[in-house]
């Protein structure tokens, strides 16, 4: 959350877009409680949060113990070895993210993103040992 606020502060045009989205959702009664329907309508705010977690993942790397031998680029890595996966590096891979060093929340609103490999964006890890608090 802190990185999202920081990035929105750096990019006032994105901050204004979030404000317009919230103004539209709460235009009839700005003092009311937030509902689940309201949260579902906050598409741009969600994209801003996801993009912040892409650039600054809450879990920068994860470790996994191999349960079987695997071969990568002709090298066999034996069962029992702990492999470390850099989520920070994965999220900045140009193969999956155009201009990976830039804060572009809109990338999460496109079909291009939804058609990407499911494990190219894993801010809370992935698989059976992922974070139970992810959204």
Language-model region placement:
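Conserved cytochrome P450 K-helix/beta-meander segment immediately N-terminal to the heme-binding cysteine loop
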Residues: 85-113
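A structure-centric feature marking long, well-folded core domains of fungal metabolic enzymes
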Residues: 11-15, 59, 92-96, 127-130
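Cytochrome P450 catalytic-core helices
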Residues: 1-13, 19-21, 135
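Amphipathic, well-packed alpha-helical segments that form the structural scaffold of globular domains
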Residues: 2, 19, 23, 49-57
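Conserved cytochrome P450 K-helix E-x-x-R motif and the immediately C-terminal K′/meander segment
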Residues: 33-75
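Cytochrome P450 heme-thiolate "Cys pocket" and heme-binding signature region
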Residues: 111-135
């Amino acid at each position: 959350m802190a990185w999202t606020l920081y990035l929105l502060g750096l990019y006032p045009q994105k901050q204004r877009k979030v404000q317009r989205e919230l103004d539209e959702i709460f235009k009839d009664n700005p003092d009311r409680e937030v509902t689940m329907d309201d949260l579902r309508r906050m598409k741009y705010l969600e994209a801003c949060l996801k993009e912040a977690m892409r650039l600054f993942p809450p879990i920068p790397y994860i470790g996994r113990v191999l349960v079987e031998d695997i071969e990568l680029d002709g090298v066999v890595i034996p069962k029992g070895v702990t492999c470390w996966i850099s989520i920070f590096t994965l999220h900045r891979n140009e193969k999956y993210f155009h201009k990976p060093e830039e804060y572009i929340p809109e990338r999460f609103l496109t079909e291009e993103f939804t058609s990407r490999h499911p494990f190219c964006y894993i801010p809370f890890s992935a698989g059976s040992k992922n974070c139970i608090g992810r959204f």
